[in-house]
Curated annotation (Swiss-Prot):
The modification N-acetylthreonine is found at T2. There is a cross-link at K203 (Glycyl lysine isopeptide (Lys-Gly) (interchain with G-Cter in ubiquitin)). It comes from the Eukaryota. This is 26S proteasome regulatory subunit 10B homolog A. It is found in: Cytoplasm; Nucleus. InterPro entries: 26S_Proteasome_ATPase (IPR050221), AAA+_ATPase (IPR003593), AAA_lid_3 (IPR041569), ATPase_AAA_core (IPR003959), ATPase_AAA_CS (IPR003960), NA-bd_OB-fold (IPR012340), P-loop_NTPase (IPR027417), Prot_ATP_ID_OB_2nd (IPR032501). The 26S proteasome is involved in the ATP-dependent degradation of ubiquitinated proteins. The regulatory (or ATPase) complex confers ATP dependency and substrate specificity to the 26S complex. PROSITE patterns: AAA. It comes from Arabidopsis thaliana. Component of the 19S regulatory particle (RP/PA700) base subcomplex of the 26S proteasome. The 26S proteasome is composed of a core protease (CP), known as the 20S proteasome, capped at one or both ends by the 19S regulatory particle (RP/PA700). The RP/PA700 complex is composed of at least 17 different subunits in two subcomplexes, the base and the lid, which form the portions proximal and distal to the 20S proteolytic core, respectively. Belongs to the AAA ATPase family. GO terms for cellular component: cytoplasm; nucleus; plant-type cell wall; proteasome complex. GO terms for molecular function: ATP binding; ATP hydrolysis activity.
């Protein structure tokens, strides 16, 4: 019995000792994990500190411009500060790219060319490129089938299949003018063709080009076309072209003369690029009557596409496109709505859908019914009558 008790006591002591060691092991494992995490954090902090020290100790570099090569090893460069230097070139730099006018990075101490830089781009031109045309399909443009076909023939076909024009023996159009009343879809057409072609898209608001300093506006036009040539295929869309493309006259202020200089630079650039080069121009205006004849002549703007007010069938197509995403209840008689929308443009038809939705919200509904559309078109018809009958005479505003 004594031996049994002794055996039980030893076993109990062994189990207790095992549990104690197990707890100690788990505690040590936890400490090791914590130490490893602290080590990772310390290494990260160390690397960050090393990078900061390198940044503080590093020497800046100079931007210069290649004037001309002297021989295979040396070039004449002009530093941004003004002086000219005869410098060497780093072995890893491709010397064929170092042509006259190339921007380069020079070492601060030895003035060795470290690498070539891309052409400097004006921030205004850079922002033009980052205008997103959106994801617009041709099916989202209603009632303009003929105009879409003509625009695609003038812009898309020369960019995608230039060999067709070579085989036939004709020169493709350089540019297209879209003209028509406001709200008929000129800008929408340009966005649709830009989003359906794998090409760069520069959207230019013509009034934003005009600068108060003489020569700056013409320089922007030059930079815009240079950038387009370097990033072919490219479509340049100039909205409200009447801001700079108005008819020239001999008299006027200095501001008028600056606008005329800008127009002359635009005319020169339109004549300058290759017919089969992949740079195409689309211009839009609702005042074609004020444009300069030199801008409108074939060879610059080869096609003039009128974007008219939609007829009854076109209004039906446009209204259905805008109403497609609206939550509706019951049957909608689009023919009755379209008959009341005589003289409406595409923007007005979109506004009908917006107003119908507002009537539904006012009635505390989350869907639109036919009566909402009828109320909306009647309301906007009254507004259109007011808009068309607003004639002001010389006595307006006088007591």
């Amino acid at each position: 019995m004594t031996d049994v008790d002794e055996s039980v006591r030893r076993r109990t002591a062994a189990v207790s000792e095992y549990r104690k060691k197990l707890l100690q092991h788990k505690e040590l494992e936890s400490r090791v994990r914590t130490a490893r995490e602290n080590l990772r954090g310390a290494k990260k902090e160390f690397n960050k500190t090393e990078d900061d020290l390198k940044s503080l100790q590093s020497v800046g570099q100079i931007i210069g411009e290649v004037l001309r090569p002297l021989d295979n090893e040396r070039l004449i460069v002009k530093a941004s500060s003004g002086p000219r230097y005869v410098v060497g070139c780093r072995s890893k730099v491709d010397k064929e790219k170092l042509t006259s006018g190339t921007r380069v990075v020079l070492d601060m101490t030895t003035l060795t060319i470290m690498r070539a830089l891309p052409r400097e781009v004006d921030p205004v031109v850079y922002n033009m490129l980052h205008e997103d045309p959106g994801n617009i399909s041709y099916s989202a443009v209603g009632g303009l089938g003929d105009q879409i076909r003509e625009l695609r023939e003038s812009i898309e076909l020369p960019l995608m299949n230039p060999e067709l024009f070579l085989r036939v023996g004709i020169k493709p159009p350089k540019g297209v003018l879209l003209y028509g009343p406001p709200g008929t879809g000129k800008t929408l057409l340009a966005r649709a063709i830009a989003s359906n072609i794998d090409a760069n898209f520069l959207k230019v608001v013509s009034s934003a080009i005009i600068d108060k300093y003489i020569g700056e506006s013409a320089r922007l036009i030059r930079e815009m076309f240079n950038y387009a040539r370097e990033h072919q295929p490219c479509i340049i869309f100039m909205d409200e072209i009447d801001a700079i493309g108005g008819r020239r006259f001999s008299e006027g202020t200095s501001a008028d003369r600056e606008i005329q200089r800008t127009l002359m630079e635009l005319l020169n650039q339109l004549d300058g690029f290759d017919n089969l080069g992949k740079v195409k121009m689309i211009m839009a205006t609702n005042r074609p009557d004020v444009l300069d004849p030199a801008l409108l002549r074939p060879g610059r703007l080869d096609r003039k596409i009128e974007i008219p007010l939609p007829n009854e069938q076109s209004r039906m197509d446009i209204l259905k496109i805008h109403a497609a995403g609206i939550a509706k209840h019951g049957e909608i008689d689009y023919e009755a709505i379209v008959k009341l929308a005589e003289g409406f443009n595409g923007a007005d038809l979109r506004n009908i859908c917006t107003e119908a939705g507002m009537f539904a919200i006012r009635a505390e509904r989350d869907y639109v019914i036919h009566e909402d559309f009828m109320k909306a078109v009647r309301k906007l018809s009254e507004a259109k009558k007011l808009e068309s009958s607003s004639h002001y005479n010389a006595d307006f505003g006088k007591e």
